[in-house]
Amino acid sequence: MKKVLIMSSVHPWNDTRVFHKEAVSLARLGYDVTLYAVASNHVYEGNIPNLRVVTFAPKSIAQRWKTWLQLYKIAKRSNAEIIHIHDPELLPLAYLLKRKHRKKVIFDMHEDFPAVLKGKKIGKMRMPKWLLRVVATTEKKMLQKMNAVIYAEKYYKENYESLTTKQMDIYNYPFLQEPTDILKYEKQTLIYAGAIHEIRGFKEMLAVAKLLKKANNDFQLLIIGKVPQRLEIYAEQFIQKHDLEDEVKLLGRLDLHELMTYYAKSHIGLAILHPEANYLRSLPTKIFEYMSVSLPYVLSNFESYGRLVEETKSGYVVDPLSPNEIASQIQVLLDNPSTQAELGANGYKQHVANFNWSVEERKLGELYDGI
């Protein structure tokens, strides 16, 4: 049985892609898998054959180097046939493992790294172009040494056309879901799950809740994910000021199985991301999760999102920076349960036909078999 070592210094051990999809799939395909990742508010019960999980406490950015060193020492001593690395900050580690220790290494790209860098700041200044070029050149040289590079989005590889190493697209599609008969919440329920940040529409969602309450709607907004302290304070003040205690619920981070139940019981999914470079062409996983439980949704009006909505007829797009427009489109859905049902059914058909993990699992197995 081939041994696989999976490592992340950023993601919690029960991350949907890292654990539930890739690690579990590899164990099911017959690999002996060990995952090193960040501890979360859930504990692995050790109930999956061939899969071991080792966690470490999350560290601040300033202290993250200690985790990198720890993972490097573990990996270089490991007898795993394949090492699967998940974070850009661990790419130098992956490069050293390949060049210095002759390990077989896969790098898994979750985001459009060049676009992310363009949005970063040093103090109050954007990263200078010369530094972006240096980082991009260095990144490509390191990626070229990998045994394989995995892309979570099809367009990512447009930045790496010069690479000749093995490459494969493995998308974040949800597990194939059976039609659900779970009862919906009595209140019309809006739901968002994922990273919580200003640029992911957190403040706009609260503003929308205020507008919907002002229009006398009986609803609730569930926001699932770890809320940074600054936004937790903002939310508490906003909720109290506008008397939204009965409407807005911040539920913290949930495990995937719990999350899917919340989705299934809700009425409308939200993905109101701001027009940041890393988001414009990258379809959020949550859209496909919404489809898998027949949940209609409201998305940002980016070109790639608009194409998906046009092709699938399963949701609506709006200006993500306009709470009034977002609230108006949600109001249309709240007032028309039959439209909710029609859009949800369209999305589920697409989930079964095109957007589920089964195909991606086969691709992952083929990639591993070829290394």
Predicted regions mapped to residue ranges:
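Conserved acidic donor-binding segment of nucleotide-sugar-dependent glycosyltransferases
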Residues: 311-312, 316-323, 332-338
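Acidic donor-binding loop of glycosyltransferase active sites
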Residues: 263-280, 295
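Nucleotide-activated donor-binding/catalytic signature segment of Leloir-type glycosyltransferases, i.e.
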Residues: 225, 233-260
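Conserved donor-binding/catalytic core segment of Leloir-type glycosyltransferases
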Residues: 5, 150, 182-209, 222, ...
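N-terminal strand-loop element at the rim of the active site
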Residues: 6-20, 24-64, 73-78, 155-161, ...
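Membrane-proximal helix-turn-helix segments that form the acceptor-binding/catalytic region
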Residues: 24, 69-76, 96-100, 113-116, ...
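Donor nucleotide-sugar binding/catalytic pocket of nucleotide-sugar-dependent glycosyltransferases
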Residues: 52-54, 129, 135-179
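A short, well-ordered alpha-helix in the C-terminal region of glycosyltransferases
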Residues: 325, 332, 339-354, 363-366
